[in-house]
């Protein structure tokens, strides 16, 4: 089974009812499967922070949302994540392609890769990095966990730390 099929099956198994996507070469196969499936509402976004708003609306309308995006846009989504998704405790799995690793041909992608995990850690958002195709087999359990609790823990006091 392809990684795209594993991702699609995991979303169906976890009753994902709404997906927004931003164009991504690495995730183009799964985006195409979502578009063709008819099993969930798919609304392409122009920007990742716009997608956060769409996902919040879908959640408030009774659907389980997910967003598919690139890690290079984490910087522009920080405000939407903190003041919308986290503040209103919206569970939102983010399937993020990870640009900028060894072999990346685009230099600016490398710079954001250096900061991606640290930015998500700062927001207390757990991350799971798939290095091999078979790692995607964990996605159904990860999605299930993500929908049991909000995307992050927001009720922390200054002296507490994030729990992942």
Predicted region positions:
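N-terminal glycine-rich anion-binding loops that anchor highly charged ligand groups
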Residues: 18-32
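Single conserved hydrophobic/aromatic residue that forms the stacking wall/gate
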Residues: 155, 160-164
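Thiamine diphosphate
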Residues: 28-99
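Conserved thiamine diphosphate
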Residues: 108-145
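A short acidic, helix-capping loop that chelates divalent metal ions and anchors anionic groups
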Residues: 101-104
